[in-house]
Every structure is written in structure tokens, then in C-alpha cells.
């Protein structure tokens, strides 16, 4: 086998491979002999059919199959020989191989970029420092009360925090439009669910009032036929309601699975959950800054094949969130996912290089600690831990999480780290989706 390597644009490479004719003919003959030996032919005992007859019947198809297998096998031998690391499947050039002639073909593919990490000591990380205090717990308790609130009709004007039940009919240039009409529509004032100006027009109105308001649909409104249009709404207020919060008592506490200890036990449970959430938020914020810095300091070429693979993953995840239809996933435009897919690939390649350069391996104690920490969110942590320990795939997933965290720790160790005191709410509101 003869091999030459061409460097094309960017990460693209082309192998020119020549396979001696004898290798091809030997493989074709071996396959024809196998057919003659194992298939039945009319008029011949099994295994006694002439090879020339088999070649006449199956020779062309066998040759094509052999060429495909030979190209794949010799491509693998070539990349091993040349120490090349492909980032995706090769494209074999169309080839014709005449009997008795050498097989000459090309394989075009992308390779992984050569990554040389730099600038790790220039990465800046601001570590948030905070704690869950009593006022944070009280605020969370109030949030829980609001979630359990009921609504009661009041003889008061509509304002932020109250809920109204309204009938409305919308029109544009005197014509009603689809989706612009409703009866007994519940609207929580101040929630910002409606287009700009709609809630403002209702504020101050009381039960039984009928009136009209003029509004404009935003230019980026989801319905194409309504974008930027001026509309008039005829509205009737059927009732105004105020939120009634439940009493903070044992009955309220029992709704959250706290059987004993009353309000103080609920507060303790809420604090524990908030502290767990806080710990994860701090970890996420540090990780986010470390990865952002790593990407900013290390610009690399990205194989298109890897981006394509990641787009497929993101498409499938999107389809699962909306019913799991694979056909629908295929129809989603790649532009929706391209930027995120490229970011994921870049981060994966750079973290992979950190792991390689630091010679990191998943630490068993860290894996165990991660599983135990995750299990505390469940009613029976021991059952969750046992499930992981008995499931090798789940354990491998957790080992990957541990390895990524160890890579982040390695980046942090070389970065410029400072501390900043923030509140619980401020930290949680800063969170962004992980890369």
C-alpha cells in the first residue's frame, strides 16, 4: 500500500492511497469461492458450481463490495501509519477499478486541531461569597405562600398584584382578527403577560366597567400578520380579585411534606434546600467564568464534522422537549443550534486538552462525593446512591462530571481569583445556562 497525505484548507486532509491489484483480485476470488461453496445453484451439487459461472453472475457486485471493504480497511491502516486523528468519517472519491489494475482512491476528512493551551494565568475569576440568611429564608417562605394563595373577589380597582377577569375583542382597522377575542380571561396585573399598554389600559378600572384602549403590537411579535400593527381592544371588567395568602401554620407546613416540627421545621428544610442551591450556583458561576476565560484565551479551528454531530444532538434534545418527534427534529433549521453547537465543541476540545496536559483521571472520592451530594435532593438518598453504584453507565456519566470539575479546578489553580460578596438573590439571578 502506498500513501501520500495532502493538507487542504484548514483542518481538511486528503489521503491518496494505492492498493496493489493482487490484493483486490485475491479478495474478489476469495468471496466468489465462498459464494460457490455455500449457495445452491440449479443443476449443480452444493459446492460444485464452476467459479467462472459464479463470477459471471456475481462478479460485478462482489467487486463493488470488496472495493468498499478494502477502501475502509486501508484507510484505517493509513491513518494509523501516518498517525492522523480524524474528526469525522471520510469521504471516499468515486472510483472505478478494472480487473488486474491497482486500486487508486482518495479519502478526504477533517482532523482534530492541535491545541496548545495558553493564557491560563490571564484568566480572571470572581468567586462569589454569600450565605443564606434569615431574611432569605423568610422571603422564600413568602414565595411558597404566594404559590399556595387563593383569589377572592374584592370591590377595588385593578392594580399590580391583583387579578382581573375580562372579556375583550380586538380589531385592526375596524376588523376583528384571529386570536383577539376572549371571555372571562384571567389576567394577573403586573405579570407582563400581555402586549405593552394592555395592562396599563386596565389599571384603575373596576368591576362592570366597559371601555376601549389603543395599543400597538411589537415589531417582533410572534404572529406575522400582527407585527407592528395598531389595534383597538373593547374590554369589559367582570371582576377584580385580590390574592389571599394562607396562614403560616401546621396545615400549610404539611403541604410540603413536613410531618413534624411545624413552621420551624419547614424553615430548616427550606434553608437546607437553599444552601444546596447556593452551593451549586457558586460552582456554576466559577465554572462559567473559567470556561469563558479559557475560550477567550485559546482561539482554535473547529472541525465542521464535530459541529454537525453536536447540532444533531441539540436537535434531538429539542425534539424530546416538544414531544420526541424525530421527523420534527430533522426539520429544525441548523441556524438555531449552530452557535451553541460550535461553543460546545470548542469547550469540549479545550477541556480535553486540559485533562490531557494535566494528566487527570476521575477521582473516585470526588465521584462518590458528587453522587452523595446529588442524592440529598431525594427522599431516600441511600436508594439513589445504590442505584448509581449498580448502574455502570450512570457511574461513567458521573465520572465524566467529576473529570470536568477536576479540569475546571486545574484552570482555577492557574487563574487570577478574587472574591466578591453578593446576596443570595443576586447570585441566583446571575446564573446562565451551562456551556
Swiss-Prot record:
Consists of 3 domains; the N-terminus binds the ribosome, the middle domain has PPIase activity, while the C-terminus has intrinsic chaperone activity on its own. SUPFAM superfamilies: FKBP-like (SSF54534), Triger factor/SurA peptide-binding domain-like (SSF109998), Trigger factor ribosome-binding domain (SSF102735). The keyword Phosphoprotein does not apply. HAMAP family: Trigger_factor_Tig. Involved in protein export. Acts as a chaperone by maintaining the newly synthesized protein in an open conformation. Functions as a peptidyl-prolyl cis-trans isomerase. It is found in: Cytoplasm. Pfam families: FKBP_C, Trigger_C, Trigger_N. It is an enzyme of class 5 (isomerase). Its EC number is 5.2.1.8. Belongs to the FKBP-type PPIase family. Tig subfamily. Keywords: Cell cycle, Cell division, Chaperone, Cytoplasm, Isomerase, Rotamase. This is Trigger factor. It catalyses: [protein]-peptidylproline (omega=180) = [protein]-peptidylproline (omega=0). One of its GO terms (molecular function) is ribosome binding. Coiled coil: none annotated. GO terms for cellular component: cytoplasm. One of its GO terms (biological process) is protein unfolding. Residues 161-246 form the PPIase FKBP-type domain.
